[in-house]
Amino acid sequence: DNLCYRYKKTSPYVLDGVSLELEKGEIGIMLGRNGAGKTTLFNNILGISRPVSGTISYDGIDMTKASRRQRARKIAYVPQNIQFGTLSVYDSIMLGRLSYFGVRAADSDRRVVENIIKEMKLEELAMRSVSELSGGERQKIAIARAMAQQPGLIVFDEPTGNLDPANEELIILEARKLAKQKNISILSSLHDINQALYFGDKFFFLKDGKIKYAGSHNIVTKELIKDIYDVDVKIITVDDRKVVVKNPMMTIIS
């Protein structure tokens, strides 16, 4: 709430009074041009950076004052690129849990990991090295690692950034299904406005370190996109979904 951040005391604010709220199970999408402040906001939420002022609250707990372990019990992170090494799928997911909650796996940890593998239909991959898997499969393992923390909020940094179109849709559907089934909130950055409209429930458009627009699908208009991205588009409806089109093809806005 009212989050402010700058790199030096004499530098301008990169985040200037940013406020946003997500309900449990709600998917929020951060949008804006490069340099708008999306990564900086995520770093503040994850505890990588500390805000100059303002609060980051979850269930009434001020996350700016929480320990690494306390934060990990509430907030998980899925980066755009994650290094798995030669670990098996099972070990990689377990590591995602033990990194925060203990050095040795207890029976309770094993049950958590085994349930995630079953829920995400990863049984056939469990003993394979993650290095052997496709990009879409690796991204699915990254989501499973985050789920192993049993968080209330998962922060995604461009979850489909390195995937082909078929896998992009699969990952978005998987993440959305888990959010709704587990009542987990998601906050994700995306460059593709059409993916965002497909994935999200609520949208936050950053400009010059401020959230200039916030709301549901209804706020997304050609005037908004012109203001944020300086791009002229048309918005049409396909199968009851808004689609942003830049003649003659759909556009990816970044």
Residue positions per predicted region:
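Conserved ABC transporter NBD signature motif
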Residues: 54-62, 71
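Catalytic Walker B motif of ABC-type/P-loop ATPase nucleotide-binding domains
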Residues: 154-158
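Conserved ABC ATPase signature
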Residues: 129-133, 137
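Conserved structural motif at the start of ABC-family nucleotide-binding domains
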Residues: 13-15
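The feature captures the beta-strand-to-loop junction immediately N-terminal to the Walker
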Residues: 31-33
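Conserved ABC ATPase "signature" region
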Residues: 108-125, 150
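Helix-to-loop junction immediately C-terminal to a conserved catalytic motif
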Residues: 46
